[in-house]
Amino acid sequence: MAKVHKDVKKIVLAYSGGLDTSIILKWLKNEYGCEVIAFSADLGQGDELAPIRDKAFATGADKVYIDDLKEEFVRDFVFPMFRANAIYEGHYLLGTSIARPLIAKRQMEIAKIEGADAVSHGATGKGNDQVRFELAYYHFDPAITVVVPWREWKLNSRQALVNYAKKNGIPIPVTKKRPWSSDRNMLHISFEGGILEDTWAEPPENMYVLTKAPEKAPNKPQFVEIEFKNGNAVAVDGEKMSPAQLLAHLNYIGGEHGIGRVDLLENRSVGMKSRGVYETPGGTILREAHSAVEQITMDREVMRIRDSLIPEYARQVYSGYWFSPEREMLQTLIDDSQKCVNGVARVKLYKGHCRTVGRKSETNSLFNLDFATFEKDQVFNQADATGFIKINSLRLRIRALMQGKK
């Protein structure tokens, strides 16, 4: 018999159909005895979404929302982040981190539509997602009730969840043979847990979904031209595309060439280290191309200041502060720097490697061959370097003189 929590009447659950949320849906019905609405955001999971509706109803959902948010995801979340060249700890392109604010945003919109007084998610008490979800919830409604089963129940391991699911007849796509969990959207797919908890063990090849093994990728390189306008990718090989279409196209191309695999031991927001394996084919290509166009269009000092902000911007996204005044402030500054980022980058894809081989801008190029050439020129007086170096070395020479007096 359900243990009724009289203060909670209706819950909107962020539901993926995976290990955690499949159990949570049933657990909420059993423990809270209230109406539970399952919400799944279509962020590009592909075939994973097909059984979601039936599975949710079979597990006890009173109502199910499956909303296509792919264009909004790429346009309003991924692209702003890529305008900042955000990368966490030098490797992670923040595919999971950037998805959570949008899921939470839509979840809160549904809660308002349905008159729900609570929301719930499947993030554990050890992870980053609990912070990302809940900071976003409170941005939209400071008084919302958040039900977090991982902080209440005694199912404290993946295997305990599997056993609970079997006991309750819940079909889940995880077995003892492949116990790792995954999270997929248009930007990436992530894997954690299981064999990946052995930091010395190489991830099994059958784990990867989006990318071919680099050694099995085509023996012939592929060249791709990506056009940018105000820092946003707008076309591939001359073909205009919507943000979601463009990223999907680059995902396919990159996946064929084994682009975008990352194996990272990262520092979580709560303080512990955790291993994550990621596939981000399209995002890897996009960031490389974006940086290339910046190289030819962005002023040196503007780039220096912007580059100094990348770690802070990435930390804010990783830690769940998307809807914060500090992230919005940085975004305003970054977007202003992107007004000149108009041009085309040419990248070469070959067996897991993505590198720039050309960049051009018809309207905003700062590259002037007359000044940059190593051949004879008429515009740069090399003797001017003497004064430049003397002025810039003044503090160093003074320091050396003063130390010599000691």
Curated annotation (Swiss-Prot):
Principal localisation: cytoplasm
Binding site for L-citrulline: 92, 97, 128, 132, 181, 190, 266, 278
Taxonomic source organism: Geobacter metallireducens (strain ATCC 53774 / DSM 7210 / GS-15)
Highest rank taxon of the organism: Bacteria
Enzyme Commission number: 6.3.4.5
InterPro entries assigned: Arginosuc_syn_C, Arginosuc_syn_N, Arginosuc_synth, Arginosuc_synth_CS, Arginosuc_synth_type_1_subfam, AS_cat/multimer_dom_body, Rossmann-like_a/b/a_fold
Subunit structure and binding partners: Homotetramer.
Lineage of the organism: Bacteria, Pseudomonadati, Thermodesulfobacteriota, Desulfuromonadia, Geobacterales
Chain's gene name: argG
Protein name: Argininosuccinate synthase
